[in-house]
C-alpha cells in the first residue's frame, strides 16, 4: 500500500520519463512537485518505491525510471480521468470530414491520422461479418501442380487464390475433398468453418476422406480467411523506428516489421472483446516480439457488419491518458461514420 506522497512521486516519475525519456532524479522531482520536502526525503520515498519494484535504476544514470509493474500500478490506481481537449476534438472531427468512396479508404485514413496524432503505430481491424456463409467451392487445375481455389460466399463475393501443390499430391485426388466441402460446409457461416479448422473437428472429419489433408486444409483455410476480409489497416508502421528503447538491434526491427505485415499475427494480439478500452504492457500482450511495447485496444461494433478493433502500439513510456482518450474518441467517431456506409 503506497502512501499519498509515494503515489505522487510515482506519478511524477512516470510523467517526466514519458516527456523526456531520461531517468528522473530527486532534485528534478523536488522542483516538479508542489510539496515542501527535502531532497533526502524524496530519495527515501524513491527507495521505498524501488523496494516495491515500481521503479528501477538504470546502469547509465543515477536517476530512476518506472518499471513495468510501476506502469501497471499507475494505470490501475493513479491515472487521472481527463477530458479530451478542444484541440484534440477538432483534430478527430477534421479527420472524418473527407468523402470516402469505400470503407477501406475510411479505415486507411483513420489509421494514418490516429498514428500522426499519437506518434504510435495505429491499427484498425475491419469488422468481420458473422452472417456470411459458404455457398460453393471448386478447384481449377493449371499447369505444373498449380491450381486456382475459388470460394463463393452468400454475399455474392468470389474469392480466388493460386496455389502450388506438393508433387506427391495429385490434383485429381482432391476431388473428394471438394465434394465433401460442398456437401458438408455449404450454408455454414465462414467464421464457424474457420473455427472448426482451428480445432480438431474439421481436420478429423477430412482425414476420413483423404489420408493426409494437411495441404488441402491450408489451401482451403487461406481462401476462407480472405473471403471474410481479414483486413488490417495500419498507420505509422515506421513509427516503431522512433521507439529507441524498444528495439535492441536490426534483427529485432526486421522481425517486428515482418510481424506488422501479417494480418493474422496482428489480429491475434489486437483482438479484444466488447467496446471497453484495454491496456496491455509488455508480456501481457503474449507476443515475444512486443515485450518492450504497450498495446491499447478498443473494440467497436457496426450493426449487421460485425466487430472491429482500434489499437495503438507504442513504447511502454507512451502518454497513456491522452492516447486512451484519443482512441476512445476515434472509436466513437469511426463507429458513426461506418454506420453511414451500411
From Swiss-Prot:
> Pfam families in the record, alphabetically?
HrcA, HrcA_DNA-bdg
Q: Does the keyword Repressor apply?
A: yes
Which keywords does this chain's UniProt record carry? Repressor, Stress response, Transcription, Transcription regulation
Which SUPFAM superfamilies does UniProt cross-reference here?
Answer: GAF domain-like, Winged helix' DNA-binding domain
GO MF term list: DNA binding
**One of the GO BP terms on file:** negative regulation of DNA-templated transcription
Q: Does the keyword Nucleus apply?
A: no
Q: Which Gene3D superfamilies match?
A: 3.30.450.40, Heat-inducible transcription repressor hrca homolog, domain 3, Winged helix-like DNA-binding domain superfamily/Winged helix DNA-binding domain
Which InterPro entries did the record assign?
Answer: GAF-like_dom_sf, HrcA, HrcA_C, WH-like_DNA-bd_sf, WH_DNA-bd_sf, WHTH_HrcA_DNA-bd, WHTH_transcript_rep_HrcA_IDD
Q: Which family does it belong to?
A: Belongs to the HrcA family.
Q: What exactly does this protein do?
A: Negative regulator of class I heat shock genes (grpE-dnaK-dnaJ and groELS operons). Prevents heat-shock induction of these operons.
Write down the PANTHER family for this protein, in alphabetical order: HEAT-INDUCIBLE TRANSCRIPTION REPRESSOR HRCA
* Name of the protein: Heat-inducible transcription repressor HrcA
Amino acid at each position: 500500500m503506497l502512501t499519498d506522497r509515494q503515489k505522487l512521486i510515482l506519478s511524477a516519475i512516470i510523467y517526466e520519463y514519458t516527456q523526456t525519456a531520461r531517468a528522473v532524479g530527486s532534485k528534478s522531482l523536488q522542483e516538479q512537485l508542489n510539496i515542501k520536502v527535502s531532497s533526502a526525503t524524496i530519495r527515501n520515498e524513491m527507495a521505498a518505491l524501488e523496494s516495491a519494484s515500481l521503479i528501477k535504476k538504470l546502469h547509465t544514470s543515477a536517476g530512476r525510471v518506472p518499471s513495468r509493474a510501476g506502469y501497471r500500478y499507475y494505470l490501475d490506481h493513479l491515472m487521472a480521468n481527463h477530458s479530451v481537449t478542444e484541440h484534440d476534438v477538432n483534430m478527430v472531427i477534421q479527420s472524418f470530414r473527407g468523402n470516402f468512396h469505400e470503407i477501406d479508404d475510411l479505415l486507411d485514413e483513420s489509421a494514418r491520422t490516429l498514428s500522426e496524432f499519437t506518434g504510435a503505430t495505429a491499427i484498425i481491424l475491419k469488422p468481420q461479418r458473422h452472417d456470411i456463409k459458404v455457398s460453393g467451392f471448386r478447384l481449377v487445375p493449371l499447369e505444373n501442380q498449380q491450381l486456382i481455389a475459388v470460394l463463393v460466399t452468400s454475399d455474392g463475393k468470389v474469392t480466388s487464390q493460386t496455389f502450388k501443390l506438393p508433387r506427391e499430391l495429385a490434383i485429381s485426388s482432391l476431388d473428394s475433398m471438394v465434394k465433401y466441402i460442398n456437401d458438408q460446409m455449404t450454408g455454414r457461416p465462414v467464421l464457424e468453418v474457420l473455427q472448426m479448422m482451428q480445432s480438431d473437428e474439421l481436420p478429423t472429419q477430412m482425414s476420413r476422406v483423404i489420408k493426409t489433408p494437411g495441404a488441402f486444409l491450408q489451401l482451403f483455410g487461406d481462401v476462407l480467411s480472405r473471403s471474410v476480409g481479414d483486413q488490417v489497416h495500419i498507420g505509422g508502421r515506421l513509427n516503431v523506428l522512433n521507439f529507441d528503447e524498444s528495439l535492441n538491434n536490426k534483427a529485432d526491427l526486421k522481425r517486428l516489421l515482418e510481424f506488422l505485415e501479417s494480418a493474422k499475427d496482428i489480429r491475434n494480439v489486437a483482438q479484444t472483446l466488447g467496446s471497453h478500452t484495454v491496456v496491455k504492457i509488455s508480456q501481457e500482450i503474449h507476443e515475444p516480439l512486443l515485450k518492450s511495447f504497450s498495446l491499447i485496444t478498443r473494440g467497436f461494433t457496426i450493426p449487421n457488419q460485425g466487430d472491429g478493433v482500434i489499437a495503438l502500439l507504442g513504447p511502454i513510456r507512451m502518454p497513456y491518458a491522452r492516447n486512451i482518450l484519443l482512441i476512445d474518441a476515434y472509436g466513437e467517431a469511426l463507429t458513426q461514420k461506418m454506420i453511414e456506409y451500411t
